[in-house]
Structures are given as structure tokens and as C-alpha cells.
């Protein structure tokens, strides 16, 4: 054996001597580095190919994936990579939003793609354990509903001492305040739910379909809430400084439109003070999307908020009101409508609900039945074809058509016949107010605006600490109502 080793050693020495003689020391050194690099690359690929869901075993985990290495999941409808890591990332995201059943279904859908069944089994057990730690929310009539108007993006322009300042100071919230509110509610264990999660429709023994309390399952310490935004129309008095009907930098520092960004997600258009037109997160929708992306456990099964729109100035910042047919060419007007429809579809695809905020924005409670019926009809004729069907009506000025008594009469019949089943007023006197009737649902909403933050911090102390939220750029004292 020693003799063989000696012979091999002599041959190896002669081999290296020949290489050095032919190529020189520098080239031989480069050659050695290349050989070592290739060996390390091969070793790395081999290790990755053995990584499964739990970190060992399984195939198809190379992160460099081509289009043919993806699959459209029947569970989520998303295009996902056919890799263990891709599966786990998506399943983890679903589990983080408390959608354990969908996460388990996704694992089952992909399970056959992996060699290591033991790792799949362990991961499924982990999901089952998390699911078991959730319990049904005891009473969905105990769910608060907070709301905002369009957010102040530029406090210098909004609070500039003109005739609109007091209104903005009373009824608007700044971006800084909104972000702080979301952070505090998240820290306190609040979880955003869809308003439809609060209820479910069931059939009775006599064949009737009625509303009952919904099934919301959350871990201990978590509590549900609903969020809505009023007047997501981007009215011209807020965005058009020179009065020509189009948004400009002379506006009062608000976003002026919802658009579909390059990534396919809904975002804002906004004019900077210097006239630069930009897109980004300047209002509730994209800001909340950003927050949920960072904190997926803030959203229950992908729930988002409600956007309430009127009709007298078009929707989402687009010139869809019939009066614009006189000012635009047919092609220009049709383009506005088409874009507004596309944005509406994208909004709903992202998990948001679009609600009616009336057509002309007057108090439904104090109006006579004839005026209300006409308003509902205008909504159906002009706005519903753009935003689609909705069963949620958010009362303008928060003015309900009744007190605590049951709905009845021509006003209710008109709204019911138009498809509305969930009705939201404003009631900040208590943490929550919900009525669930056989054929409709009512919920009170709490305004988190300048007036509420400044004048009634004790009424919202279970939600936030208003004193630490209020923006230093907000003029004080905030006017009284």
C-alpha cells in the first residue's frame, strides 16, 4: 500500500511540474480556482435540490424558476412556483391571516410534488395546531367600525387658512395620523375583518333565508373591527385649485385619483406642491395595503375595507358624470368610464368592498321618501354600472332613516329593492352598535378624524390613544361642531 502511495505521489508531482513548465505558475493558479468554483457550485445545487418544506428532503426547490415551473393554484387562483419554498411562503401567508383551511388545502394540492412526505405531514400538523388555538368570536354585534375621509397628504396646503381649512380640520385625518392609528390598533390586537364576515345567511325550517351572526375565528388576544372610507370621489373643491375641473398642484394637498399601477395594484395619483405628478400611497387604500403587506396578521383572511362613493361628481376621480359628455369627446368620456370600471374591478379583486354613499349626498333620515327614492334610482342608473352591485349603503352624514326601531316604510323598501342589505350610520357614543335582523343588518361607525381625536379622546380610548396620534401639523384648537 505504501509503495502505491509513493508511486502516485511521484506521478502527481511530475504532473504538476509539467503543468507549471507548460503554462506557468499564474495560469495554473487560475485553473485551480476555476476547478474549485465549479465544484462548490455543483455542491450548492445538490444541497438545494434536497431541501423540502421542513428544510430537508424533496425536489424542485431551485429558486431560479422559469414560467413553465409555475402552476395556477386551484385553491388561491394565484400563479405559484412549483417549489417547496414557494408553497410554504404562500401557505405561511394564508396562515398568518388566519385562513388555516385554505393553507391546508394548498399543502394538500401540492403535496404530491414533494418526495419527503414526512416534512409535509409535519408542516400540516403545525398548521392544525395553529388553527386549534383559534376560537369563535363570541358576539359579532360587538365589532367596532371605524371610518375616515380622504387623507390629508400635504398639511401645508390643507391647513393654509383658506375657507376650507376648518372643514378639513374637523372631518379629515392626516396620513401621519392614519399610520399611527393603524400601528396602535395592531399593537392592541385588532384585526380587520370584512363587514360580511360579521354575518351569514342561513335557511330556516320554513325555507326563508335570514341573517345570523357570522363565524370569525381568532387567536386569544385578537379582536375584530371594520374599516370604511367615505367620499372616495376626490371632489374638485379638494383637488382643483384653478377651477377648470381638473386636479392640479393648486389643490389642497389630497390625492386626486385611484389608478392601477405598473404592478397591477391600485394606487393614487397626486400632485406635489411643485406640480410634479406622482403615483403612490397618498390615501387609505394603498396605505392600508402597505400596512397589511408588512403585517398580514392585521387582516382576517385577506379582508380589506369599504370604499363609499357618491355619484354627483363621478367616482374615484374620473369624469364619469353625464355632464362631462358635453365637455369631452365621446371617445374621451368613454375612456373615463372604462378606466373607472377597471379600477373598480381591481379594487374588488384586492379584497375591498365598494359601497353606496348615496348619489347626491344629502341626509337620508331628514329627506322625504320621494327624494330618497329618486336618489337611489340615480345611483342604480349612473353609478352601479361602473362600480358593480353592492349590498352595503353608508348613510351620508351618518344620518339613518330610523332610530333603534325596526326599518319599515317607503324609504326602506326603496333601498331594499335596490339590493342594499347592510346599512351603516354614525354613532361614536359607544364602542360598537350592531343590529342583525332577518333581512338586513345595521352597524354604527366611529369617526377617527380631527374632531374626534381632539374633542373626544375618551370615547375612543379602547381603540387608540388619541393624544399620541394627533398630528403636530394640525391647527389647534380644532373647531367645534
Whereabouts are the PLM-identified features?
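C-terminal active-site subregion of NodB/CE4 polysaccharide deacetylases
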Residues: 104-120, 128-198, 211-227, 235-239, ...
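Membrane-interface motif at the C-terminal end of an N-terminal transmembrane signal
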Residues: 42-54
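Metal-dependent polysaccharide deacetylase catalytic core of the NodB/CE4 family, i.e.
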Residues: 141-161, 207, 211, 219-225, ...
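Functional beta-strand-loop-alpha-helix junction segments that form "active/interaction loops"
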Residues: 199-204
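N-terminal Lys/Arg-rich, disordered targeting/topogenic segments
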Residues: 1-26
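N-terminal, intrinsically disordered, polar/charged segments of Gram-positive cell-envelope systems
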Residues: 51-136
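Hydrophobic membrane-insertion alpha-helices, especially the h-region
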Residues: 31-45
